[in-house]
A protein has these predicted regions:
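Non-catalytic terminal accessory segments
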Residues: 27-31, 104, 331-429
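His/acidic metal-ligating clusters that form di-metal
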Residues: 101-105, 203-205, 214-303, 320
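Bacterial Sec-dependent N-terminal signal peptides
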Residues: 1-27
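Active-site glycine-centered loops adjacent to acidic/histidine catalytic or metal-binding residues
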Residues: 38, 113-114, 153, 245, ...
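Extended active-site neighborhood of metal-dependent phosphoesterases/phosphodiesterases
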Residues: 125-230, 262, 301-305
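Short, solvent-exposed beta-strand-terminating loops
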Residues: 32-63
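Core catalytic region of metal-dependent phosphoesterases/phosphodiesterases
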Residues: 64-70, 78-165
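Active-site-proximal beta-strand elements of phosphoester/diester hydrolases
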Residues: 31-43, 81, 201-212, 243, ...
Length: 429
């Protein structure tokens, strides 16, 4: 009997150690990062006709801006009136404060472009530079020791919207994010406008989508694709995340393409060819939640891209940021959580200065996926098209709009949502 109990005790002890080891391994392999996009901070929020304020901001150092904004009611107020507007200082600060609460020590932070406010012009270059420096300062104050991986968007230029950045912008942009953007990555950015960053066994490749946007014909674009191909074909490269601002594929809002068609197909073919290495692609630009699925020539889903929502609510969307949990060994994303600020639930006639971004949308649960993968996103699209109950459409709608109740028919009409899904399919040729 003694031997029996001793054997049982020994078995339970071994089982307990195995469970403990598994839990420890899970904790070690699971890491989390922040993904942010389309901040569109407006330093002249509510005061674009105020020439005195403009001159004050232009003449002040960017690290003096905080005091200026803190004395401005327009900059500090958070309320329902911010819907369809760029971000004021109140929203930007609230976003960063909530990021720090939700994930105090991220493995890294990805920012997928568009820091500068809409309708900025080349004449605003001084404010643009200080705007970038100010945003970078705030991120570095909140996350002093965290690597920050920023991409450039179409608004991020000293020229007009969508115009390729010049060398001065590359230098200013890289310097603004140093030292959180490591020097080796910053040097690449200064030289060519795109770069890579390695952490553990993951390589992040940050493209400059200004080279690819529809109607552009920049001679530097082929060199960027060559750089991408060279890195992906390297035997030492095992796990890759690709980051950009403007996604490939169709723009359902105006019927055009986001990129030049040839560039789109070149990118699709590269992603399909190296799909075993590319564990995630990230884009933004639309201000809404979405995805793309890459299919090989046999029509099998082999890779996916996530399009992440924005801090700016200029498209009528809720301000949002994401926490992504990933396996540090395989570098595949396990879970995504969008934290958003429900602006419509706030008063219109008065504002708050502190807001909790508590409402969440998550993957894979939000779209009833079994896991976050190309195959599951593809199945979701097939199931939605066949669903007569509209339940999956409602799930997609909530996911796409980040919980915003938008009246605009271009976003809530069923036909248009099916167009979005059609645009989400990218096939090898």
């Amino acid at each position: 009997m003694k031997n029996h109990f001793y054997g049982l005790y020994l078995g339970l002890l071994i089982l307990s150690n195995l469970v403990s080891s598994f839990n420890s391994f899970s904790q070690v392999t699971a890491k989390k990062c922040l993904i942010v996009s389309d901040i569109h901070f407006d330093p002249l929020f509510g005061s674009h006709s105020d020439t005195v304020l403009r001159r004050k901001l232009e003449r002040s150092s960017f690290d003096e801006w905080k005091k200026i904004f803190e004395s401005s009611t327009a900059q500090m107020t958070i309320n329902a009136g911010l819907l369809f507007q760029d971000a004021n200082y109140g929203v930007l600060k609230s976003a960063l404060d909530n990021m720090k609460v939700k994930l105090p020590h991220p493995a890294f932070i990805i920012i997928a472009g568009d820091y500068i406010w809409h309708r900025a012009t080349p004449a605003d270059s001084v404010l643009k530079r200080k705007c970038l420096q100010f945003i970078a300062l705030l991120f570095k104050e909140h996350f002093a020791d965290t690597p920050i991986i920023p991409a450039m968007g179409n608004n991020d230029t000293y020229g007009a919207d969508y115009i390729l950045q010049d060398r001065k912008f590359f230098n200013d942009f890289a310097d603004a994010w140093a030292p959180n953007l490591p020097k080796s990555s910053g040097d690449q950015l200064k030289k060519q406008g795109y770069y890579s960053y390695e952490t553990g066994n993951l390589k992040l490749m940050v493209m400059n989508s200004a080279l690819l946007s529809f109607g552009s014909h920049y001679p530097q674009a082929p060199a960027m694709f060559s750089w991408l191909q060279t890195n992906l074909s390297d035997d030492k490269t095992k796990n890759v995340w690709i980051v950009m601002h403007i996604p490939p594929g169709a723009n359902v809002y105006n019927g055009s393409n986001f990129w030049n068609v040839d560039y789109t197909q070149t990118f699709i073919n590269s992603v399909v060819k190296y799909s075993s290495k590319i564990k995630l692609s990230i884009a933004s630009h639309t201000h809404f939640n979405d995805f793309r699925v890459f299919y090989d020539a046999a029509n099998d889903p082999v890779a996916y891209m996530r399009i992440v929502p924005s801090i700016s609510s200029s498209h009528g969307n809720n301000p949002s940021f994401e926490v992504a949990e990933f396996n540090s060994v395989t570098c595949r994303v396990i879970k995504e959580t969008n934290y958003y600020l429900d602006l419509a639930a706030l008063p219109k006639d008065k504002g708050v200065t502190h807001a909790l971004w508590e409402t969440t949308i998550s993957l894979p649960i939000g779209l009833k996926l079994s896991e976050i993968s190309a195959g599951d996103f593809s199945k979701f699209m097939d199931n939605l098209k066949a669903d007569q109950s509209w339940q999956l459409l409602n799930d997609y709608k909530k996911f796409y709009t980040v919980g915003t109740k938008i009246d605009s028919s271009i976003r809530t009409n069923k036909v248009n949502y099916l167009k979005y899904l059609k645009a989400d399919s990218l096939k090898e040729k």
